[in-house]
UniProtKB/Swiss-Prot annotation:
Functional description taken from the UniProt entry: Activates expression of the rhaBAD and rhaT operons.
Predominant place of localization: cytoplasm
Classification via SUPFAM superfamilies: Homeodomain-like (SSF46689), Regulatory protein AraC (SSF51215)
Name under which the protein is recorded: HTH-type transcriptional activator RhaS
GO cellular component: cytoplasm
Residue ranges flagged as DNA-binding region: 191-212, 239-262
């Protein structure tokens, strides 16, 4: 597995934060790093496989990667990221208690992926721009200024994330997409889902298409297929059982959609034929 080292990314041996744009981010094999990373998705779509679990990401997704997490990107489509790298809590001179603003693992579950709306994403861009222009002076005021900007970024992400509630349509859509991640295998009635999240059906269709480039049903199908591919690789369930577990009522229809999406059959995936030589 590829290991990325801080010496290759941070401007100096003492700098606690670095900015790494990926415009766009191509598919990238599984890797981990000796630093932490906040991945901010500007726009586009892709699959983020995080510690073996697949997540569909799009504009407004924020992922918090710890120094022991492993991840990769695949099936990227104009996926543009800004990566905010930071060494460790101990690397800061003026900041303490950062972990209170970061996702916390509880009972083995780590809520690594947050979502923010487009208004918050614009504020994030402005803050990252200030961080990039803050210079690399090592006197106390310069260091404190850079650390303050990083703290402001964490506060903004925390306040803007899904956990803080939603009022506008953009934020409601974020909640809906998070709901689909957990309920993808259920029979979905889009009229009922739109009502559940206080959106008109027309607004749901328009905004989901703007965020992902896909209609609601195609987005749901892709989500189901991604989950199915994970089970094919990491479980002993039969293809038919996996199809049903992932919301498909017909295994033949599932196999047709699967091949269309990934250019491999479920049996090919089960046998590891899609593995890319490293």
């Amino acid at each position: 597995m590829t290991v990325l080292h801080s010496v290759d990314f941070f401007p100096s041996g003492k700098a606690p934060v670095a900015i790494e744009p990926r415009l766009p981010q191509a598919a990238f094999p599984e890797h981990h790093h000796d630093f932490h990373e906040i991945v901010i998705v500007e726009h586009g779509t892709g699959i983020h496989v995080f510690n073996g679990q697949p997540y569909t990401i799009s504009g407004g997704t924020v992922c918090f990667v710890r120094d022991h997490d492993r991840h990769l990107y695949e099936h990227t489509d104009n996926l543009c990221l800004t990566n905010v790298l930071w060494r460790s809590p101990e690397a800061f001179q003026f900041l303490a208690g950062l972990e209170q603003l970061l996702p916390q693992e509880q009972d083995g579950y780590y809520p690594s992926h947050w979502r923010v709306n487009q208004s918050a994403l614009q504020q994030v861009r402005q803050l990252v721009g200030l961080m990039e222009r803050a210079g690399d002076g090592m006197d106390a005021p310069a260091v404190a200024n850079r650390e303050i900007l990083f703290m402001q970024l964490l506060v903004l992400l925390r306040r803007s994330s899904l956990m803080e509630g939603a009022t506008d349509n953009d934020a409601k859509l974020n909640q809906l997409m998070a709901w689909l991640e957990d309920h993808f295998a259920e029979e979905v009635c889009w009229e009922a889902v739109a009502e559940q999240f206080s959106l008109s059906l027309r607004t749901l269709h328009r905004q989901l298409k703007q965020h992902t480039g896909l209609t609601p049903q195609r987005y749901l199908n892709r989500l189901r297929l991604i989950k199915a591919r994970h089970l094919l690789r990491h479980s002993d369930h039969s293809v038919t059982e996996i199809a049903y577990r992932c919301g498909f009522g017909d295994s033949n229809h599932f196999s047709t959609l699967f091949r269309r999406e990934f250019n491999w059959s479920p049996r090919d995936i089960r046998q590891g034929r899609d593995a890319i030589p490293q």
